[in-house]
Amino acid sequence: MITFLLLFPTFVDDFNKLLIESEKVHLKPNERLNTELRIFALIRLGITDSVKIAQFLRYSVTTIYNYRTKARNKAACNRDEFEKYVMQIGSLEQ
C-alpha cells in the first residue's frame, strides 16, 4: 500500500473530503492506511468486487460489505455516488 500512496499521495485527505466532518478518518501515529482506507484504495484502483477485496485483504466478504456500507452512510455527498467519487480521487476529473 506504500506504492499506492506514492501514486495517490493525497488519497487520505481527498477521501476525508468526501465524509461529513464528524466522521473523517484519523490515522494512528505511524499508520498509513487503516482497514477502511485499504478497502477504498483497492476500489480506487478499480477492484470493486467485494469477494476479490476480501481475498486480497484476508477479511470476510461481510466485513468488506459492512465497511463499504458504513462509509457510504458517512458520506458528505450523495451516498449512491460515493464510490464514483472515490474512483475520481487523483484523476483529472476531480
What is the predicted function of each stretch?
Residues I2-Q94:
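Cytosolic nucleotide-binding catalytic cores of signal-transduction proteins
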